[in-house]
Amino acid sequence: MTSSTQDAAAELRAAVQEYERTDNVGVLFDRVRTVAATVSPAVLKDACVPFREMPEVIIPAYEQIVSQAPGDAQALVVLANAYWLTGRGPDVVGDLASRAIAADPENRGAWHLWALAESNVRERVARWQQVAQRFPGDQLARAAMADNATSLASAEHDPQALDLAIRTYESLLAESPPAAQRSALEHTLKTLRGWQL
């Protein structure tokens, strides 16, 4: 039985090394699940830190964590994000994000995934508006809202969506972003202001 974070991390590292040699994701999942079944969620989280960019490790590990700690908002977000990155689909991601929001309404990552998981662009804009209102300093949420409003304006010739996009980009520009962001925002605004819907 694995007893420590170091032991669990070593077992995960060995599993990943074998995966890198064989490219057998099924064996990797099985080995990660075996480790996950022998340690506490806290130990497993710590052991997974070096592999946080590998959904192949995170998914089976965090499925176990979430099954043992279903109210752990951050674990739900980590699992939802790994699912999102591997194309698992908006329904499962949205469900996990909603559970994370219920567990911790202040978890911005949960709100972001909840908004991303909406497949209807008009509804996605509405979700990003909710996130931006809840977290007014969240520039990423506001940029996502503006990007989605731009898509909506383009696809449906919606002048209200265009106005929302322009106002939001203008507010981001007014916050004195770094030069590269400023240039991108200015270019975007120039383009959008020239649209005829």
Labelled PLM ranges:
Residues 1-84, 95, 195:
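N-terminal alpha-helical interaction modules that lie
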Residues 66-67, 98-102, 130-137, 167, ...:
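Conserved structural position within tetratricopeptide repeats
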